[in-house]
Each structure stands twice: as structure tokens, then as C-alpha cells.
């Protein structure tokens, strides 16, 4: 099993030193789901929400969150992201919204946390915009779908999960 990279020999948390790592193209994708009543989802899809375009706001929030991940997650490095993309899709058959984020850069550390943060904050934004009409909205699951680049190799979630 791999060792925890953010814990030193004394058991103390620290930020990993990436200065000796090679710069490679790194990419990560994550997803989040927001489940709600069919009436709430219809209001979003039909553009009838009194707060405005829920998907556009969630998309911008997710992009902004990816860029600020290093301020939210204590041991993350500040990164120069070259791409952040947020896709939102209504899934009326499940009364939910599926959010998929993509983050990319050429650098010395991965972008998994940025992708996860982007999807999570986009989901939280949907909740925030819809909580006046429905308080029992459910967020989750949130998960990493894939990552590529870097020394640890590629990862892709099993298609059956």
C-alpha cells in the first residue's frame, strides 16, 4: 500500500515538495449529483427559477472553485490551470442533475482536488439557488472519474461503478 504523502516521519501534516518532479500534462475528471423533486428540476430546466440561470451560475462557481482550491484545501499547491470545464446535465428520469468537471495543466502535481472541488462547489451552488423552494435536496455521490499524467500513473473508474 502507498504511504500518505502529506504526513512526515513524525506524523505531522506538511505540503509535499514537488520541486524535483517533472512537468507533465495532467488531467482529472470528477462528477457530482444533485437530486431533487421533479418540480424543482423542471423549474431549473425550464428557466423559471426566480434567481436566474441555475446552470450558468453553477458552471461559473465550479470554474472559480477549481482556481481557488489551494485556498480551501490546506495542503494543496496553487496551480496554473490551463483548462477548467464544467458540464451540467439534467437527468429527469432520476430527478437529478449530473455535474462533470475537467481540469488540466502542465505541471508538477495533479489536478484531482481541483476537479473534485469544482464539481462539489457547482453542486453546492445548485443547492444554494434552490433551497428556497426545496430544503431536502441531496448532494452526492461526488467522486473522481479519471486522472492522467504524473508518476503515479493513470486512473479511471471502473465502468461498472
From Swiss-Prot:
- Pfam families attached here? MoaC
Binding site residues for substrate: 75-77, 113-114
**Assembly and interaction partners:** Homohexamer; trimer of dimers.
Does the keyword RNA-binding belong to this entry?
no
Q: What is its EC number?
A: 4.6.1.17
Lineage of source species: Bacteria, Pseudomonadati, Pseudomonadota, Gammaproteobacteria, Enterobacterales
UniProt function note: Catalyzes the conversion of (8S)-3',8-cyclo-7,8-dihydroguanosine 5'-triphosphate to cyclic pyranopterin monophosphate (cPMP).
Q: What is this protein's name?
A: Cyclic pyranopterin monophosphate synthase
Q: Which residues form the active site?
A: 128
Q: In which pathway does it act?
A: Cofactor biosynthesis; molybdopterin biosynthesis
Q: Which GO terms describe its biological process?
A: Mo-molybdopterin cofactor biosynthetic process
UniProt keywords (A-Z) are: Lyase, Molybdenum cofactor biosynthesis
Q: Which family does it belong to?
A: Belongs to the MoaC family.
Q: Species name for this entry?
A: Salmonella typhi
Reactions mediated catalytically: (8S)-3',8-cyclo-7,8-dihydroguanosine 5'-triphosphate = cyclic pyranopterin phosphate + diphosphate
User: What's one GO MF term for it?
Assistant: cyclic pyranopterin monophosphate synthase activity
Amino acid at each position: 500500500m502507498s504511504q500518505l504523502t502529506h504526513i512526515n516521519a513524525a506524523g505531522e501534516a506538511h505540503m509535499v515538495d514537488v520541486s524535483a518532479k517533472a512537468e507533465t500534462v495532467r488531467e482529472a475528471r470528477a462528477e457530482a449529483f444533485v437530486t431533487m423533486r421533479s418540480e424543482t428540476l423542471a423549474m431549473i430546466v425550464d428557466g423559471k427559477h426566480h434567481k436566474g440561470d441555475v446552470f450558468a451560475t453553477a458552471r461559473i462557481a465550479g470554474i472559480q472553485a477549481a482556481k481557488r482550491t489551494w485556498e480551501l484545501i490546506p495542503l494543496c499547491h496553487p496551480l496554473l490551470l490551463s483548462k477548467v470545464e464544467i458540464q451540467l446535465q439534467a437527468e429527469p428520469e432520476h430527478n437529478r442533475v449530473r455535474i462533470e468537471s475537467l481540469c488540466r495543466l502542465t505541471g508538477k502535481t495533479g489536478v484531482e482536488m481541483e476537479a473534485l472541488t469544482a464539481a462539489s462547489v457547482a453542486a453546492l451552488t445548485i443547492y444554494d439557488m434552490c433551497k428556497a423552494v426545496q430544503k431536502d435536496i441531496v448532494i452526492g455521490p461526488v467522486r473522481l472519474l479519471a486522472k492522467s499524467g504524473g508518476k503515479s500513473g493513470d486512473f479511471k473508474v471502473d465502468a461498472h461503478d
